[in-house]
């Protein structure tokens, strides 16, 4: 097991897509002497089994910019790093059952137009041209974002990890953080199973384990909770095998679920009411 280096400018705790993305982006901002510590393998917490949706649709201007940056990055990372991300630019649909939904779509479209993310408000008849398997009963239209889609979370994380390493960052896997202490100098000492490291900054990107890491520095109420969520993947389907173009990710607010193509089958994710 590789012993950890003794000093760094910044230490990220957690090797999911959030921690690795931060590491990658800090190298792009010119930061040096960066370290990430992961207790298992990269993505081995919650990231690896995420459904990987990458929507452009949001009612927040700031999030719209983040979403657009993310999809543009996932499309370009393979050229930069040689590591495929598994991004599918199949587009997305959000179904509307009420005229109020359409009115909200116009508000959202104004935001996406402002940040440069293509978006359309389409009729029920136009939905059939994009997704032939949707029943149109009660549907009055949809919000269509043609350039987003979904990505492979593990492949995307590994591509950013390679980019971060290329930028000089160091990643230590299979090394659990056991404690974090503030030193009189104002620096932090991060204790791990394979040695200790002193740094200027610590980032808690531990996902489900964020509260535990927070308690190491006296933060008892980090606003992070786990949510129960399932998705199911069907067998291959003969009608999907006939398709020449991948189906868009579809979100149905009435069913509180999303649906997308997975290989030659479907992936369906319902949101539980009491999650």
Residue ranges and their predicted role:
Residues 18, 42, 209:
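Conserved Rossmann-like nucleotide-cofactor binding loop
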Residues 52-130, 254-259, 263-267:
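Dinucleotide-binding Rossmann-like beta1-alpha1 core, especially the glycine-rich loop
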Residues 27-48:
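Glycine-rich FAD pyrophosphate-binding loop
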Residues 23, 27-28, 163-165:
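Gly/Ala-rich phosphate-binding loop of Rossmann-like dinucleotide-binding domains
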Residues 143-201, 209:
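Helical element adjacent to the flavin cofactor pocket in flavoenzyme catalytic cores
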Residues 15, 58, 206-207:
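Glycine-rich, N-terminal phosphate-binding loop of Rossmann-like dinucleotide-binding domains
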Residues 4-18, 35:
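Beta1/beta-strand and adjacent pyrophosphate-binding region of the FAD-binding site
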Residues 21, 180-275:
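Flavin-dependent oxidoreductases
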């Amino acid at each position: 097991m590789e012993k950890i280096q003794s000093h760094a400018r910044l230490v990220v705790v957690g090797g999911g897509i959030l921690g690795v993305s931060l590491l990658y982006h800090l190298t792009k901002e010119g930061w040096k002497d960066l370290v990430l510590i992961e207790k298992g393998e990269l993505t081995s917490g919650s990231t690896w089994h995420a459904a990987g949706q990458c929507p452009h649709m949001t009612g927040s201007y700031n999030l719209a910019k983040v979403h657009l940056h993310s999809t543009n990055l996932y499309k370009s990372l393979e050229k930069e790093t040689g590591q495929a991300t598994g991004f599918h630019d199949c587009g997305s649909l959000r179904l509307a059952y009420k005229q109020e939904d359409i009115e909200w779509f116009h508000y959202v479209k104004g935001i996406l137009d402002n940040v440069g993310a293509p978006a359309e408000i389409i009729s029920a008849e136009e939905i059939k041209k994009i997704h032939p398997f949707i029943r149109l009963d009660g549907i009055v239209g949809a919000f269509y974002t043609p350039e987003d889609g979904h990505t492979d979370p593990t492949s995307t994380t590994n591509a950013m990890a390679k980019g971060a390493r290329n930028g000089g960052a160091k990643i230590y896997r299979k090394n659990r953080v056991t404690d974090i202490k503030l030193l009189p100098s104002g620096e932090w000492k991060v204790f791990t199973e394979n040695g200790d490291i002193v740094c200027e900054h610590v980032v808690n990107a531990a996902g489900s384990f964020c509260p535990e890491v927070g308690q190491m520095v006296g933060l008892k109420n980090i606003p992070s909770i786990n949510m129960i969520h399932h998705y199911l993947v069907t067998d291959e389907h003969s009608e999907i095998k006939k398709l020449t173009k991948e189906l868009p990710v579809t979100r149905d607010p009435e069913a509180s679920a999303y649906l997308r193509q997975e290989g030659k089958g479907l992936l369906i994710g319902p949101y539980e009411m009491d999650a």
